[in-house]
């Protein structure tokens, strides 16, 4: 019994370092918020201006890697000997479900405003040209390019899972072919895993920092409860307690049902916005934006604005590429797990087409609605942001729709459920990654899951206390830097091992 407990307990070398590092950073931040904001601005400026080009080249190289997988020697290779575990329709639906987080609802509703008010290519703010390019840039940041990079890593993890039969819960497990077993299981592998976990903790904290204000603003609109930082903290605490109860009482089936409800409700809410906002305008704007994307794509891919120094690519493209990089391993492991039995070509095409369709639908519908409300002077987003914050501006884009009370209830429920499932997924992923071994069908220890959910909640509160989007953007970019190198190593390890062991 003691041996079994030891086997399934925490792995100290990957549990305590991230806990200590994140704890110290949170403590230093809370000690002096003003000094923390100065450091945040300096880190953001350094990484985006000095290393922004590296993120852009990474995405381009991975896109070529996607073409190599689709048309190269591994295209028809099957990821496992079994037939596909899920039907194609269910597989695509599960992909869509992974795209409907509250953080995505946050950016989908407000992103276009920033692109129009501070446009790229020295365009005039709020001009026709800026509006024509606004949605095109959203389609660029949330389109085939990042999903192609994810598909490459998903193939890599699926290969290690189903072809090489490796039990991969941390990235170091995949690096044996590249650096050897001694280094992968030694100090080097431990450092890699700690980089991954620290970055993942901050990424999840930022998602919570984006999602929570949406829920509290909904509560203010529906119930008249003033939105304060204290209310944000109370809501996060309630989510953590609810997650602990679900885990302790074995209510994971209920969480799964909630996740399904989130997906169906997302379809319903998007359909409602599409119909009442103006379906013909949305389709025309989308069509025009695809054309703009194709016309400007080469410029977008390599745009650093080194001469003009307007800051658009640093504030948005580099930020989003870091966002994609930081979530790459977690998302790719999930997408690989549900793709057993697929061929490499099926996985690559399915991900790019299915997931691009999901994000394009979200951004087109929500972004078009925001643009229409701005053009018709129904809402004044700059004033709302200045007086009440970004979350209030997002809420008003939903409240301006017909049947506003019913719409707001739907949005409130969607955001609430999305955040509950987010915290559940966060605690599960971090607990799995910091335990010695969890067999199939077993759950990671309860206290470990609760502990990680508390830490993620604390990070969300700290980021909310700092205020604005810059701390959230900086947390993503700073975390994306080490994961940038980890993702490259996982990719190279897959290529090396596949050449040796995945032959006809």
UniProtKB/Swiss-Prot annotation:
One of its GO terms (molecular function) is (R)-carnitine:4-(trimethylammonio)butanoate antiporter activity. It catalyses: 4-(trimethylamino)butanoate(in) + (R)-carnitine(out) = 4-(trimethylamino)butanoate(out) + (R)-carnitine(in). This is L-carnitine/gamma-butyrobetaine antiporter. InterPro entries: BCCT_CS, BCCT_transptr, BCCT_transptr_CaiT. The chain crosses the membrane at residues 10-30, 51-71, 92-112, 143-163, 195-215, 231-251, 263-283, 316-336, 347-367, 403-423, 446-466, 475-495. The lineage of its organism: Bacteria, Pseudomonadati, Pseudomonadota, Gammaproteobacteria, Enterobacterales. Pathway: Amine and polyamine metabolism; carnitine metabolism. GO terms for biological process: 4-(trimethylammonio)butanoate transport; carnitine metabolic process.
